[in-house]
Amino acid sequence: ARLKGMVRIRNAKNVKILGRGIIDGTDNKSNGNGRFKDEPWRLIYMENSKNIEIKGITLYNSLKWTVHPYNVSALQIDNINIVNWDYGSDGIDLSSCRDVKISNSFLRTNDDCIVVKAISFDEKMHYPNPRIQNPNIKNILVEGCTFWNMEYGNVFDIGFELRCEKISDLTFKNCDVLIQEGRGSVFTIHNSDNAIVENVLFEDIRVENADLASNSKLIDIAILFSIWSYDKFEDYEMIKKYRYNDSWDNLIPVLPGKEAFHSSHRGHVKNITLKNIQVLDGKLPYSVFNGFDKDHIVDGIHIDNMTVGGKRIKNKEDLKLYTKFTENVTIK
């Protein structure tokens, strides 16, 4: 069966979407504002729900984000296929979720393949409105999946919007990355808000090729101030004037006199492990670990048994690693 349209699940328990059918977004039209939940930019949107299972289906040609759960717990996604090519067509965006398992699935997207965020599309998106803290994120497992990331975005991405107190205990294991085509990266943490991101494990990941773009990255872990930050400029004309692309897209500078204000809204990244990572083919892209300032650092990145073309990475030079405001990096 082919469903042309979209699925919405709200304030529900014990919901299953099963079978071998297709949810097709080809005919979905947008009025241009993807921030609203009921826009057809999302093929499956869930919120404030529990015990949800999605299994066996194919999701095709999403306008933007494909599967987007917000504040969902006990979510299982197994043996699904996502095939997109439009810009911004993220695969699975886990927003403020807990106790999630994603397994045995294939994702081909033209933006982030799988993303962990803390963001609600009900909240006011900028200052001076009161900060809205989303539920914490914990216990996410992604295993046995295959990814193909096209020109935009990243393969595994935590961020940019991380508006909660803590994101912890995330595991990505036994996955294959067929290709990373654009200027993004394979392993990514972009903390653009105030959260503490800790205890993240990438294990037994095979990357066939990660260097098709000249400025692509393998590992990108950073604490940033960007157009996605909650404390960004309120005036959109200022954002357009100042934003720039460097190693990351859509950065904005900290203006003179605003250093303490923006520093107070940055978070932390600590205890991140990459174990048994294989880059099988192509040249090795560079990697970057970048804190925000001396009080908001990247702390404790552990790389254990990473190989490129069969050769083991033994030090920062082998990894082509650049660091700033970063401490306690181990490579063995």
Give the role of each language-model region.
Residues 1-332:
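Extracellular/periplasmic carbohydrate-active domains that bind, remodel
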